[in-house]
Amino acid sequence: MVAEKPKAAAKIAYALSDGRGVLRCSEYGVPYWIVRRDGAAIVVAPSAGHLFGPHTDSRGFPVFDFEWRPIFEFDRGAGYLSKFYRMLSRILPGASLYVNACDYDIEGSVIGFKIIEAFGDVNRARRMKFSTLAPQDIRRAYARMERLDVEMIEAGMARSEMDWLWGINVSRALMEAARRAAGRRVILSAGRVQSPTLVEAYRRWREINLHVPKASVAVKITAEKGGGVFDARPHGWKPQSLETARSIKSELRKNPWLAVEEVRSERSILRPPPAFNLGDLQKEANRILGLPPLRTQSIAEELYLEALISYPRTNSQKLPPSINYRAILDKLAHGPLGREARELLKETGGVLRPVQGSKDDPAHPAIHPTGEKPSQRLSKEHMAVYELIVRRFLAAFSREAIVSKSSVLLRDFQGRVWRAEGLRVEDLGWLKYYHYSTPGEKPMPPLDRGDKARVVRVDVRVEWSQTPVRLDKASLLRWMESVNIGTEGTRARIIETLYKRGYLEGSRKSEVTPLGEAVAVIIQTLFPELSKPDLTRRFESMIEDIRSGRRTRQEVIDMSKKTISKLLESFLDRLDTAVREIGVSLGSVEVEAACHLCGRKAVSAVSGYRLCSHHMEAFDRLRKALPNLASTISSTPREALEAIARGRSRAGAWVRDVAALALRDDGLYKALL
């Protein structure tokens, strides 16, 4: 029996032993376990993830010949795999039956299959399918073993082979372009999913740095009635300038009374959220705990190996009726969230009907707790993610939350209408369990039509619009999900690869590095088809077709080779004309004229200052926006530029650069007007 990792192998062995003797053995320093069940001796042996992968000895590109070989033979960082290889090669031959007990996904299917193919006999092989490592689930999977999941194996092998073909050919092509441009070897990497993700990061980074904020004037009044205080804002109108807003403030100081014209209230229902899939968990852990997506995924996988939660790499938001939820809640009632579990059982009377989300996964249900107790004390981070999963699971069985919203329209002595809003949670419902989504209450004093309220404070301020895009790990993950590239289990790893390669940097807010900018520009120049998600998404769909039996692996690999060949032909056609630009992007070719502000290649000059394409676009955007900015904040253009140059305006870095330079140079200042 082949397990994906040593910890999983141990859990499987002890589950199958029914508490009887488990013999722990070791070969080449790698543990494996022997148990007896139903009169048979079962050897549970672990791998350490993928033991085999595609490789070639061919040089240059295009390269389409490869074979599956032990990864440690060609990857210097995978030397630790050799001891697993030797252990498996020693104990697998000669068994009467082979069982793939790796995780039930396309990666696990390939890991187990390649090991059995290398050291055993795939004609005497079976597949165990389980979603948790809890003892009862392992025993059930053992009793219901099926034939090898050939479609999953073929889909997994196709993905590995396809990603290898794209990665090696495009990376070698990029390095050849860099070698010709720079006159030296430059290590660059690209990939079917990695490349469009990098280009999207570059696009977002440019938009953030080119952002010219819009200014608006906000007026907020604080009013009082019968000892109760509330806030109100303009309704159906807004001050067009700072000067107008200040005038309104002065008027309301002299005549501070407002008449209540309309009072409305309504009750809203907040439906419980479904249990997590991996993407939802990663986004919520980032929002609530500040964890990067890959860290959340790693923690969830460790919780799974501890048998505390179900398999996390799932796209499903559904909890099927086949799971014994009452048994899980009974166990949770004696754990760290026992009070909440007991409360839910009391609330539902034991009738457990979970909310179902729209997304499904044929292999696994939504992430849920098993109710098992940890074998060791959990770290603070592990406990926080575990609590998030348990609370979301409990919320899925709870009733709807009810909130009461009130809206009040008031009129001042000049006839201007103001709107006040209140919110009160009437019934917490599922929010008792998943409090992270509880809306903030805004109390409103009792108000009736005709009542008078007195203005006690008027706040006037300039608000600057934020850039419409973000660049961090969580926002890239959301983008990959929205365009359907990558898988639940690979997206966070691909994003992390962009940081490890030195293309992106920063944690909470990310930046594209000079190397990342160069690679993104080269991909857009030489592989424009690979800079968009369409091509990647099309091949993702083909993988699903293999999994569902609509296509064969060979069909998809042949199509990949054909597409790569066409891309490389276009690449070679474009290469000669792009060599110099690539050298400039890599910083290996000295530019004839450098940007005054950043040293990049200048594309134009304004008032004697040479500017690169980034700063030139920033100049153009700022010039178009400046008159309206000055008018809104009731200032001169110079004062508006001073506001832009300060960080508080939320202007992009390149826009601030141009504004600061214009404030120092009258010629550039006049060019902006």
UniProtKB/Swiss-Prot annotation:
Which residues are annotated as active site? Y311 (o-(5'-phospho-dna)-tyrosine intermediate)
Give the C4-type zinc finger regions. Answer: 595-615
Q: Which GO biological process categories is it annotated with?
A: DNA recombination; DNA repair; DNA topological change
Please list where the region (Interaction with DNA) is annotated. 189-194
Q: What is its EC number?
A: 5.6.2.1
* Keywords noted in UniProt: DNA-binding, Isomerase, Magnesium, Metal-binding, Topoisomerase, Zinc, Zinc-finger
Q: Say which domain of life the source belongs to.
A: Archaea
Pfam families, per this entry?
Answer: Topoisom_bac
Identify the residues that the record assigns to the Topo IA-type catalytic domain, covering every copy. 149-568
Q: Which InterPro entries match?
A: Topo_IA, Topo_IA_2, Topo_IA_AS, Topo_IA_cen, Topo_IA_cen_sub1, Topo_IA_cen_sub2, Topo_IA_cen_sub3, Topo_IA_core_domain
Q: Which cofactor does it need?
A: Mg(2+)
Q: Where is this region: Disordered?
A: 352-374
Q: Where is the Toprim domain?
A: 1-134
Q: Which Gene3D superfamilies match?
A: 3.40.50.140, Topoisomerase I, domain 2, Topoisomerase I, domain 3, Topoisomerase I, domain 4
- Residues engaged in binding Mg(2+): E4, D103
Q: Which GO terms describe its molecular function?
A: DNA binding; DNA topoisomerase type I (single strand cut, ATP-independent) activity; zinc ion binding
The record places the site described as Interaction with DNA at H55, R159, D163, R313, R501
List the catalytic activities from the record. Answer: ATP-independent breakage of single-stranded DNA, followed by passage and rejoining
Record's subunit section: Monomer.
Entries under NCBIfam families matching the protein: PRK05776.1, topA_arch
Function recorded in the entry: Releases the supercoiling and torsional tension of DNA, which is introduced during the DNA replication and transcription, by transiently cleaving and rejoining one strand of the DNA duplex. Introduces a single-strand break via transesterification at a target site in duplex DNA. The scissile phosphodiester is attacked by the catalytic tyrosine of the enzyme, resulting in the formation of a DNA-(5'-phosphotyrosyl)-enzyme intermediate and the expulsion of a 3'-OH DNA strand. The free DNA strand then undergoes passage around the unbroken strand, thus removing DNA supercoils.
Q: Member of which family?
A: Belongs to the type IA topoisomerase family.
From the Swiss-Prot or TrEMBL record, give the protein name.
Answer: DNA topoisomerase 1
Which organism is this entry from? Aeropyrum pernix (strain ATCC 700893 / DSM 11879 / JCM 9820 / NBRC 100138 / K1)
UniProt gene name: topA
